[in-house]
Amino acid sequence: ETHVSAAGSLFGNWNYNGLNLGLLHTHSDARLKKNIEPIPSPLTKVLQLNPVYYEWREDILPSAFVKNHRQGRQIGLIAQEVEEIIPEVVREEKIYDGEWKGVNYEKLTAVLIGAVKEQQKQIEELKTRITELES
C-alpha cells in the first residue's frame, strides 16, 4: 500500500522482483508509539543467532532473482532459526511462486543495540570488581 502525504512525500512498503523494499528511514517518533517497553534479555537472544555463509539456490529461485542479487557466497541468517528466537523480525511473504520467510535486519538492529548495552554493563561491572580486588 502506498500513501502520499499532503507535502507530497511518498511512503509505504513495496515488493519488487520479490524483494521487500522499505524506506531509507523508519518513523520512530515517540509520539507515534504506545506500550513502549525494553526488549528482555537482548544479549541472550543475540548469542543464540547463527550467522552463516550461503549461496542462493538457483534450482528453486527464478534466474531473474539470482541475477538481480549478488551471486556467489552470501552472508546472513536463516529466517527459520531467527524466528524461534526473535519472531518479531521474521515475516513470510508470497514471492514468485512460493511463500518464503525473510529477516528484517533493520528491526534486528534494535536487538543488537540492546545486546551491546547489556554486554557493556557486564564489562563495567567486571572492571569495577577487578579494581576492588586489586586494591
Q: Which residues fall in each region the model found?
A:
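Stable alpha-helical elements in mature extracytoplasmic
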Residues: 42-45, 78, 112
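Short aromatic/basic micro-patch
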Residues: 76-77, 102
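Active-site-adjacent helical/loop segments in soluble small-molecule enzymes
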Residues: 54, 82
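Trimeric beta-solenoid/beta-helix "fiber body" segments of extracellular/virion adhesins
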Residues: 1-30, 41
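C-terminal intramolecular chaperone/auto-processing assembly modules
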Residues: 28, 33-35, 65, 87-135
